[in-house]
Regions:
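Transmembrane helix-bundle signature of multi-pass membrane transporters/permeases
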Residues: 99, 129-136, 162-166, 304-315, ...
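Hydrophobic alpha-helical transmembrane segments
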Residues: 106-111, 129-143, 203-210, 253-254, ...
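Short, non-helical or kinked segments that cap or interrupt transmembrane helices
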Residues: 87-104, 111, 124-131, 152-159, ...
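Alpha-helix capping/termination and helix-coil
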Residues: 275, 279, 283, 295-299, ...
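Juxtamembrane transmembrane-helix boundary motif
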Residues: 2-86, 102, 106-117, 122, ...
Length: 390
């Protein structure tokens, strides 16, 4: 009973926010459709690339000749997206982007209109950005609840980051919606991922790990408890406990190890991270993870849940900004199926991540960052992928 009451406020908050967001989106649907029809009308008619054939079957967003999406493939890909985000607190938006841009072919499709119909190019690009964020938003909500129940979420730190993230999540859609071409989006997307991957690679070196004694000690204590097969209740009891709360300093313990952070620094970090994440059309977890491990000094076992809480707030604000303030459209049939997959993957991730050593969670992060970064830097800035699929 006490546990249920403990998580009730978070559940109610998430459902209220999602309800308000959904209501607002229904109101602006007609405006979004009008923008799409106007962009299609300005596109040259024909059967060549960069042209619209009115007689072709309707595909993505109802555009004649656009890719026809396989909803089952969307479901399966979303399970992977939900699992990876809920396991490491990052790469949900990036993997959603890989699916929408590459697996479904929306990236190459949008590129065909680069010169013939810039308005349609940018409209599809914005749609991809928001679609990514819908998937990450739900995964973040589910992951936050799961990790909170497990005692693996630092709520004060997540809230401080979220407060700062609100400004960035509002500002970027207003400044960039309808102004970013697909090629530039892909290039910047990959560059940001590649840089962060290199940063996390350094943290995996002996020199990088030597600076994180508290995180290493806490991770070892947690891993020892898992090997001893302690019950879920015992693990939760040794989880996050806030011992001191102040405007400039917050302290908490995790498996007997004490940690400290400055909420003001966290809020400032959240502002810049959310701004970049909103521009890239992703959740920002791949930026929050290095912030939480390097600046806050947390072990990976606390990073996923704390990152998820912050990402959830940023995603709600950013989706609202894109779809309500800038009338961006999404393919609701695809999003609906993908959200089912996200739910499945996000329920599995927190339950499997505890069996993966802390260092291997970081290494998984690095491998994915290098692959995704190389692919989109090369495709965005050089016109061809250096890694498969080419």
């Amino acid at each position: 009973m006490e546990e249920s009451m403990k998580k009730l406020p978070i559940l109610l908050t998430i459902f209220v926010v999602l309800g308000l967001l959904a209501t607002s989106l229904v109101v602006v649907h007609s405006s979004s459709a009008a923008s799409l029809e106007e962009a299609i009308a300005k596109t040259p008619v024909g059967t060549e690339k960069g042209q619209i054939n009115p007689d072709a079957p309707k595909g993505y967003l109802g555009i004649p000749g656009a890719p026809s999406l396989n909803l089952i493939a969307g479901l399966l890909w979303a399970i992977w997206v939900g699992w990876i985000f809920s396991s490491v607190g990052a790469f949900g938006g990036i993997m959603a982007g890989v699916g929408h841009l590459t697996v479904f072919g929306l990236g190459d499709y949008a590129k065909t209109f680069k010169n013939t119909s810039p308005a349609l190019n940018k409209l599809v690009t914005d749609s991809i950005r928001v679609s990514n964020q819908w998937l990450v938003g739900l995964s973040a909500a589910i992951s936050s609840l799961n990790y909170y129940r497990m005692g693996r979420l630092v709520a004060p730190l997540g809230i401080a980051l979220a407060v700062g993230s609100v400004g960035g999540s509002i500002l970027i859609p207003i400044l960039t919606a309808g102004k970013i071409k697909l090629s530039a989006y892909q290039g910047y997307f990959g560059l940001a991922v590649f840089i962060i991957g290199g940063f996390l690679f350094y943290e995996n070196t002996p020199r990088g790990q030597s600076r994180k004694k508290e995180a290493k000690a806490a991770a070892q204590a947690f891993e020892k408890s898992i090997k001893e097969k302690k019950t879920a209740a015992e693990l939760t009891a040794m989880g996050v406990k806030v011992t001191n709360f102040g405007l400039t300093s917050v302290s908490f313990t995790f498996f007997g190890v004490e940690f400290h952070f400055n909420p003001i620094v966290a809020a400032i970090g959240g502002l810049f991270i959310a701004a970049l994440a909103s521009f890239l059309g992703i959740g920002g977890g791949f930026l929050f993870v290095p912030f939480l491990t390097s600046v806050a000094g947390l072990p990976m076992y606390l990073v996923a849940g704390t990152s998820a809480l912050t990402v959830f707030v940023g995603m709600v604000v950013s989706i609202f900004s894109y779809m309500v303030l800038k009338a961006t459209m999404v393919q609701w049939s695809l999003i609906g199926m993908e959200l089912i997959g996200i739910f499945i993957g996000s329920m599995i991730g927190p339950r499997t991540s505890k069996y993966i050593p802390d260092i291997w969670l970081k290494r998984l992060f690095v491998v994915l960052a290098v692959y995704v970064g190389l692919r989109y830097v090369s495709k965005g800035f050089f016109g061809t992928s250096w890694v498969p699929p080419y």
